[in-house]
Amino acid sequence: MLEGAELYFNVDHGYLEGLVRGCKASLLTQQDYINLVQCETLEDLKIHLQTTDYGNFLANHTNPLTVSKIDTEMRKRLCGEFEYFRNHSLEPLSTFLTYMTCSYMIDNVILLMNGALQKKSVKEILGKCHPLGRFTEMEAVNIAETPSDLFNAILIETPLAPFFQDCMSENALDELNIELLRNKLYKSYLEAFYKFCKNHGDVTAEVMCPILEFEADRRAFIITLNSFGTELSKEDRETLYPTFGKLYPEGLRLLAQAEDFDQMKNVADHYGVYKPLFEAVGGSGGKTLEDVFYEREVQMNVLAFNRQFHYGVFYAYVKLKEQEIRNIVWIAECISQRHRTKINSYIPIL
């Protein structure tokens, strides 16, 4: 028997939840991956993908087929699915889905700013932007010279506007300041998304809060790793960490003081969930920290589908689909470059 909250969930969101679960069921299987890694050419890869749920998604492409074309078309397909969810959603699911797009918008803004810094054409950079993070004012990003310019002229009408409150400055947007801006925006965004999920309560909070806590901790580890050997001070590094997660607050304080990977690993050793991840880095498989984080992310997102009546399945599906796209692109790159020794280094999902 459904309780009140679950009954209302089904009335407003049951159709879309059923749909996204159906989409998840169409993710590539382990057998699909076994078949893909045996392909000799990108045309072979295309033919096999046609036998899966991807169907004729490359039908309109003329030869030669490239990895970039495959990547672009898979992203477009994911974006089409997501837009369908969004166009048929009711509040508060609509707001949840908007939060999901913000991370892609941040990445696109940073990509465009770096492109402008390197004097690349806007058209070239727009082609590399993620379709889930597109917004009307994107093409004007390259005119901004400071974060204040960026906010006042371009982003004030976008969902990113609230995250700029802690980022306003008149500093010139050089490479370092652009990277700092990315991390500050992500910090504000993750904190806001976490607060939204926590305040929503119910199963959505139970599923999404641990996922976002992991994302916050992952960002803290990666920020720390990337700051070694740079001019970023320990004090400034600490201001970039999201203020929630398993590491908050003591682990973040210790991370801020870390001076190399071993010291960072020592911090992770205090946390049962992160110790085995760091122990898996390197070894016979040659895994990077990024690899083990992706593997953990996949596990958490697969588990999200074990619960019902929550928004987390939409987040989890998009993340799993993105990992599938990364897997296919990795296999396609290995085939294209005839570098087959690492072709099995993808991250299985199902």
From Swiss-Prot:
Pfam families: vATP-synt_AC39. Kidney, osteoclast and lung. GO terms for molecular function: proton-transporting ATPase activity, rotational mechanism. The keyword Lipoprotein does not apply. Keywords: Hydrogen ion transport, Ion transport, Transport. The keyword Ion transport applies. GO terms for cellular component: apical plasma membrane; early endosome; endosome membrane; extracellular exosome; lysosomal membrane; membrane; phagocytic vesicle membrane; plasma membrane proton-transporting V-type ATPase complex. V-ATPase is a heteromultimeric enzyme made up of two complexes: the ATP-hydrolytic V1 complex and the proton translocation V0 complex. The V1 complex consists of three catalytic AB heterodimers that form a heterohexamer, three peripheral stalks each consisting of EG heterodimers, one central rotor including subunits D and F, and the regulatory subunits C and H. The proton translocation complex V0 consists of the proton transport subunit a, a ring of proteolipid subunits c9c'', rotary subunit d, subunits e and f, and the accessory subunits ATP6AP1/Ac45 and ATP6AP2/PRR. Subunit of the V0 complex of vacuolar(H+)-ATPase (V-ATPase), a multisubunit enzyme composed of a peripheral complex (V1) that hydrolyzes ATP and a membrane integral complex (V0) that translocates protons. V-ATPase is responsible for acidifying and maintaining the pH of intracellular compartments and in some cell types, is targeted to the plasma membrane, where it is responsible for acidifying the extracellular environment. May play a role in coupling of proton transport and ATP hydrolysis. Regulator of osteoclast fusion and bone formation. This is V-type proton ATPase subunit d 2. It comes from Homo sapiens.
